[in-house]
Curated annotation (Swiss-Prot):
Belongs to the CcmD/CycX/HelD family. InterPro entries: Haem_export_protD_CcmD, Heme_exporter_D. This is Heme exporter protein D. It is a single-pass membrane protein. PANTHER family: HEME EXPORTER PROTEIN D (PTHR37531:SF1). The lineage of its organism: Bacteria, Pseudomonadati, Pseudomonadota, Gammaproteobacteria, Enterobacterales. GO terms for biological process: cytochrome c biosynthetic process; cytochrome complex assembly; heme import across plasma membrane. Required for the export of heme to the periplasm for the biogenesis of c-type cytochromes. It is found in: Cell inner membrane. Its main location: membrane. GO terms for cellular component: ATP-binding cassette (ABC) transporter complex; plasma membrane. The chain crosses the membrane at residues 18-37.
Amino acid sequence: MTPAFASWNEFFAMGGYAFFVWLAVVMTVIPLVVLVVHSVMQHRAILRGVAQQRAREARLRAAQQQEAA
């Protein structure tokens, strides 16, 4: 198997189309990174909301038991 490029400089130059190739790479990677960060933030927010709701329900149950006693 022969390499497509003879050197790293040739690889980064992409046969004279470096601007377009690397611009396409950047325009693909940035949205993917944003998507991952947003997904992680949403996941944490959902878990935090569930924990708050469970705590609220536990407080309500405790208050109801205290009133009944």
